[in-house]
Amino acid sequence: MQLRVERKFETFSYLPPLNDQQIARQLQYALSNGYSPAIEFSFTGKAEDLVWTLWKLPLFGAQSPEEVLSEIQACKQQFPNAYIRVVAFDSIRQVQTLMFLVYKPL
């Protein structure tokens, strides 16, 4: 018997996958706090991978969650076999404040 173990990446991975509306709410929280979102992807999705590939540049001028969601969709289309996550950075404290997975390949 083959047992498939699903990887857990962060807190949200213990919940059902986030839909676009839930992702938009998280993005709205980040933007309303002045955080700069960025999209990263990895083909292995290993938690121990410290460096994921950055999709384009961080979205410093993003005003709405829809802008970020459209970039997430573009990343999914370009790399359908990659894990995709959103990270947000606080430029005042110069730290990463938020990170969550938005797409896992089948």
From Swiss-Prot:
InterPro entries xref list: RuBisCO_ssu, RuBisCO_ssu_dom, RuBisCO_ssu_sf
Keywords: Calvin cycle, Carbon dioxide fixation, Cyanelle, Photorespiration, Photosynthesis, Plastid
UniProt GO MF annotations: ribulose-bisphosphate carboxylase activity
Gene3D superfamilies reported for this sequence: Ribulose bisphosphate carboxylase, small subunit
GO BP terms, alphabetized: reductive pentose-phosphate cycle
Compartments it resides in: Plastid, Cyanelle
Pfam family, one: RuBisCO_small
SUPFAM superfamilies: RuBisCO, small subunit (SSF55239)
GO cellular component assignments: chloroplast; cyanelle
PANTHER family reported for this sequence: RIBULOSE BISPHOSPHATE CARBOXYLASE SMALL CHAIN 1, CHLOROPLASTIC
Summary of the function given for this chain in its UniProt record: RuBisCO catalyzes two reactions: the carboxylation of D-ribulose 1,5-bisphosphate, the primary event in carbon dioxide fixation, as well as the oxidative fragmentation of the pentose substrate. Both reactions occur simultaneously and in competition at the same active site. Although the small subunit is not catalytic it is essential for maximal activity.
Known partners and oligomeric status: Heterohexadecamer of 8 large and 8 small subunits.
Recorded family membership: Belongs to the RuBisCO small chain family.
HAMAP family named in the record: RuBisCO_S_bact
Miscellaneous: The basic functional RuBisCO is composed of a large chain homodimer in a 'head-to-tail' conformation. In form I RuBisCO this homodimer is arranged in a barrel-like tetramer with the small subunits forming a tetrameric 'cap' on each end of the 'barrel'.
Protein name: Ribulose bisphosphate carboxylase small subunit
Organism: Cyanophora paradoxa
Gene field: rbcS
